[in-house]
Amino acid sequence: VLSAABKSBVKAAWGKVGGNAAPYGAZALZRMFLSFPTTKTYFPHFBLSHGSAZVKAHGZKVABALTKAVGHLBBLPGTLSBLSBLHAHKLRVBPVBFKLLSHSLLVTLATHLPBBFTPAVHASLBKFLABVSTVLTSKYR
């Protein structure tokens, strides 16, 4: 559960991301694909090379979903319900992959925002991404 301080940290950190959300989302996907090759399984039709249009487009989708979630921290289940249905019932993404993407996103944010990525912000973002992952996997049962 995100505390008031966590929510404040998440909103402030995501605000620093600003217009870079889509490129950071794509970079996080690239990191995940390179670091955890089994995650490529769900993207057999994508060109997964560096800078590909498909990875950029999917990175933008990830970033848009996270931006929406940041704007609705008090109702993540309601906000992400459609995405949860999609990933559980249609795409059947391995729940572990959300943790791997979360890790890759944290590394990406730490790389681009080193002065703002304090231990407290890191912890708050980690909790937030864990909550998002929990919501996205909640309909797998």
UniProtKB/Swiss-Prot annotation:
Disulfide bond positions: none
Tissue expression as described in the entry: Red blood cells.
In-chain residues carrying the UniProt-annotated modification N6-succinyllysine: 7, 11, 16, 40
Self-association and partners: Heterotetramer of two alpha chains and two beta chains.
Modified residues (Phosphoserine): 3, 35, 49, 102, 124, 138
Taxonomic source organism: Odocoileus virginianus virginianus
Keyword Acetylation applies: yes
Keywords: Acetylation, Heme, Iron, Metal-binding, Oxygen transport, Phosphoprotein, Transport
List of residues that carry Phosphotyrosine: 24
Entry's Gene Ontology cellular component terms: blood microparticle; haptoglobin-hemoglobin complex; hemoglobin complex
A GO BP entry: hydrogen peroxide catabolic process
GO molecular function: haptoglobin binding; heme binding; metal ion binding; organic acid binding; oxygen binding; oxygen carrier activity; peroxidase activity
Protein name: Hemoglobin subunit alpha-1/2
Modified residues (Phosphothreonine): 108, 134, 137
